[in-house]
Swiss-Prot record:
Entry's Gene Ontology BP terms: microtubule depolymerization; mitotic nuclear membrane disassembly; negative regulation of axon extension involved in regeneration; negative regulation of axon regeneration; negative regulation of mitotic spindle elongation; regulation of ARF protein signal transduction; regulation of microtubule cytoskeleton organization; regulation of mitotic centrosome separation
Function, as annotated: Guanine nucleotide exchange factor for arf-6. Involved in response to injury in mechanosensory neurons. Inhibits axon regrowth via microtubule dynamics, possibly by inducing axonal microtubule catastrophes. Limits microtubule growth near the cellular cortex of early embryonic cells.
SMART domains (UniProt xref): PH, Sec7
Top-rank lineage group of the source organism: Eukaryota
The protein, known as: Exchange factor for Arf-6
Organism this protein belongs to: Caenorhabditis elegans
Single annotated GO MF: guanyl-nucleotide exchange factor activity
Summary of subunit composition and partner proteins: Interacts (via short N-terminal region) with microtubule-associated proteins tac-1 and zyg-8.
Extent of Low complexity compositional bias: 326-347
Entry-linked Pfam families: PH_9, Sec7
Length: 818
């Protein structure tokens, strides 16, 4: 209705050829609707000005007897000094007529007739903007946006020939907010529009107003699509578009029209809409947030405050904060190449000591222009919000892998928390490093500068070491091998036409880094990369041709757990003599299968594979599982009661299965027992809760899940300790229920089974503790070696490649040189 009334009134008045004569009796008429108050007469009397006071902020008074010079700044800027308020003389009449800018967006569309008569017959319009976005118009931007300023007084014709004495933008400090007035508009009436927005349309508590008593308030950039509520500062602006399922803040129509080159949060369609605020000077709502369009057409929010709200950027070394217990000083050496290149997230603003005005660079990505959210990162709500955003990023919901990489590279406290939650979603336990790298790069695309890429690779390395602490000794080893795999991938599958790298060259190059890896593992990794290249560009798969994000927001079906022998970590291997004693269900093995046979065993993840020799035959994935045994909740221990053979150890698997193995010496026996127990302790899922019964001494045993556990080692250790305490209570209850005069076989068998469970979990605890202690000792030894002056002198004398040779920067340069 407001638009129809405004359009009809303006079209009717646009047909008037000449200005009305001064001797005509003055009358006033208004067309009032929801958010538009249109005056059909240029001269408004004091009576209607008083009626208009209902639309003005509280405290504004209109008195016709007061001379315009005697009005206060707030009253004069409110636009209440109408021509009919003082009729004492022509000079006073001229002074009392205040020019009012009128939005000409509709008149411009009517053609030359409206352009010709817009200065004489366009009505005075005061648009009360309630929800329109707030813009910041510079004096130099008026010509670019093709806007006109129409003054509604006849005295303006006389002043058109006078040049403007001051075309610069001036700052007017008000008691409540900070208003920017452009002399090109020549309208103090816009100030009252802004004040009415703050006081009448927005109900903000007084505690949340940021008073600006200085002439240079600080401006910090917030993320797009931010809307403030009446409860204080806006909620977290970080990646609101990803969280569209919870908040509904993302318009799907605007999303589908964005170009592929721009970010999915770019308001391209929104900028095309004709809103009254496009012709205003500056309006600031109660929250103090203002929108403005930059040169690239992207819009951002500006937060006006005199307080220093500089975001506290995280440390450049992310691993020191996330995995502090897993790091060693060697990381500083491997970061030397990254520090040489310009940082992707260097601070682009320079703030003064007293909080001067500063703006971020217009070329920076909108994904990186996020401030620290109002939600505390240490609160439960902040962690919950970060976990939800991380889940959306992990599922590529309304975003691409390119945008995920930009989001993870942001440098603020809340983004750091999102990064931690995002990494926790990757479960690399029992997964070989090349398969884990493929999974990580399928969701995160390596882009940007070398420092940003290397930071993502180091974050991946830290997470892989967290999930597999028994494979590598330090973070540097994981990071070195990761960069080496990327170098190998670019050499084997890159556009270079030279000689391809061989397995011997690959092993030799890694040996120069100072890190020691098993030769068989390097051969396996080389063959895997050679047969299947690592894809480094996945953003095109996650978006449609017109740039809109593909429909990945639907709930993905739950994946069925599969074991791929070719992508699982191999912990140990060797020839063994095998004999089945009991089947997986606890029954005795048939006589024909109980003989001793030689096999080549491979311990990969939670599965023990058996082959005829060390070169497995090319079979399918499921065919290899036929000659395999699952080791979840298994226990390996020497079998001194077996007298027929020496160096024999027993493996008891879940639900009663038992297998005997014979080694060639005592050392191999201890190695096999240690590796099998570690795998079972680290990756066996916790048992399901016990059933509720009135007789706990006869209750069935809990079920043992087959799915591997993806919790860290420390969490598994605490779980096993709690299980031992629970078993002690159960053993005590069963012992009290046994009668010495009339023993019950069921209760006795249960007591034996509980005692075995206690011994199994106690063995798990000891194995995990030894593993953690060995890792700490290795880290301490590495630190001592690095801090020894003799060691430093020896390293300087050796003409070998430094340990950070295979960082990502050198890897890329090395790939280009081939």
């Amino acid at each position: 209705m407001a638009k129809v009334a405004s359009s009809g009134a303006e079209e009717a008045l646009a047909t008037i050829d000449g200005a009305p004569r001064r001797n005509v009796k003055k009358s006033e008429a208004f067309v009032m609707s929801g958010d538009v108050l249109i005056s059909l007469n240029r001269n408004v009397s004091s009576t209607y000005a008083k009626l208009l006071g209902d639309q003005l902020p509280p405290g504004t008074t209109v008195a016709s007897s007061i001379h315009p010079h005697q009005l206060s700044r707030a009253t004069a800027s409110a636009g209440v000094s109408f021509p009919s308020m003082n009729r004492n003389g022509a000079a006073a009449q001229k002074l009392s007529r205040l020019p009012v800018p009128v939005s000409t967006s509709q008149i411009e569309r009517r053609g030359s007739l409206a352009r010709k008569t817009s200065e004489e017959s366009s009505p005075t319009a005061i648009r009360m903007l309630k929800t329109a976005p707030i813009e910041r118009m510079e004096s130099t931007d008026v010509e670019e946006s093709e806007e006109e300023t129409v003054m509604m007084t006849t005295d303006e014709k006389e002043n058109q020939k006078k040049p403007n004495e001051n075309d610069d933008e001036v700052m007017v400090v008000d008691e409540e907010q900070f208003i920017v007035v452009s002399n090109d508009m020549k309208s103090p009436n816009e100030e009252i529009v802004a004040k009415s927005l703050r006081s009448a349309m927005f109900t903000m508590p007084t505690d949340n107003h940021h008073h600006s008593y200085n002439s240079s308030p600080q401006i910090s950039t917030l993320s797009p699509h931010l809307r403030s509520n009446g409860d204080g500062p806006s909620r977290s602006p970080v990646y609101d578009d990803v969280d569209d399922d919870l908040n509904g803040s993302l318009d799907a129509k605007d999303m589908s029209n964005n170009s592929h080159q721009q970010s999915f949060r770019s308001p391209e369609n929104y900028s095309e809409k004709d809103t009254p605020s496009k012709h205003s000077v500056v309006t600031i709502d109660g929250s103090g947030v203002s929108n403005h369009y930059d040169q690239d057409g992207m819009f951002s929010h500006v937060y006006y405050s005199t307080q220093d709200t500089t975001p506290k950027h995280g440390s450049p070394s992310l691993r020191k904060q996330i995995f502090e217990s897993r790091t060693t000083p060697n990381t500083a050496a491997s970061n030397s190449s990254a520090s040489a290149s310009p940082s992707l997230h260097a601070t682009s603003e320079s703030r003064g000591a007293t909080g001067g005005v500063s703006l971020r660079s217009a070329e920076s990505s909108n994904l990186n222009q996020t401030a620290v959210p109002s939600t505390s990162t240490n609160s439960v709500g902040g962690e919950r919000e970060a976990a939800q955003i991380a889940r959306n990023l992990y599922e590529l919901k309304n975003c691409t892998s390119t945008q995920v990489a930009d989001r993870l590279n942001e440098q603020n406290e809340f983004s750091f928390l999102i990064l931690v939650k995002y990494l926790e979603l990757f479960q690399f336990s029992t997964t070989r490093i090349d398969a884990a790298l493929r999974e990580f790069l399928s969701r995160v695309e390596l882009r940007g500068e070398s420092s940003a890429r290397e930071r993502l690779l180091r974050v991946f390395s830290a997470r892989y070491l967290e999930c597999n602490p028994a494979i590598f000794d330090s973070l540097d080893e994981v990071h070195t091998l990761t960069c080496a795999l990327l170098l190998l991938n670019s050499d084997l599958h890159g556009p270079n036409m030279g000689k391809k790298m061989t397995a011997r060259d690959f092993i030799t190059n890694i040996a120069h880094t100072g890190c020691t890896f098993k030769r068989e593992m390097l051969k396996t990794l080389f063959q895997s990369i050679k047969d299947n290249a690592i894809s480094l560009q996945n953003s095109a798969k996650n978006s449609t041709a017109n740039g809109s994000v593909a429909s990945t927001s639907r709930r993905q079906p739950q994946q069925i757990y599969e074991v791929d022998p070719d992508s699982v970590v191999e912990y140990y291997s060797g020839f063994l003599m095998r004999k089945y004693v009991r089947e997986t269900d606890g029954g005795k093995t048939p006589f024909g299968r109980r003989s001793w046979r030689m096999v080549y065993a491979r311990l990969r993840g939670l599965v023990l594979y058996f082959d005829t020799d060390e070169h497995p035959k090319a079979t399918s994935r499921y065919a290899s599982l036929e000659n395999a045994v699952s080791l979840h909740h298994a226990l390996a221990e020497p079998a001194p009661d077996y007298k027929k053979k020496s160096f024999v150890f027993r493996v008891r698997i879940a639900h009663g299965g038992e297998i005997l193995f014979q080694t060639s010496n005592q050392k191999e026996l201890q190695e096999w027992c240690e590796k099998i127990n570690f795998v079972a302790a680290a990756f066996s899922s916790p048992t399901l809760p016990l059933p509720v019964t009135s007789k706990p001494e006869t209750a069935p045993m809990p079920r043992l899940p087959r799915i591997p556990c993806l919790a860290p080692i420390t969490k598994q250790l605490s779980t096993h300790e709690a299980r031992v305490a629970e078993l002690n209570e159960m053993i005590e209850i069963v012992s009290q229920s046994v009668s010495p005069n009339q023993p019950q076989q069921l209760i006795t068998d249960r007591w034996v089974l509980l005692s075995f469970e206690k011994r199994r979990y106690s063995t798990y605890i000891n194995v995990l503790r030894r593993s953690l202690e060995a890792r700490k000792a290795s880290s301490a030894t590495t630190m001592n070696i690095m801090m020894t002056p003799t060691r430093r002198q020896q390293q300087n004398q050796k003409p070998v490649v430094s340990e950070d040779r295979l960082s990502y920067t050198d890897a890329v340069n090395g790939a280009a040189a081939h």
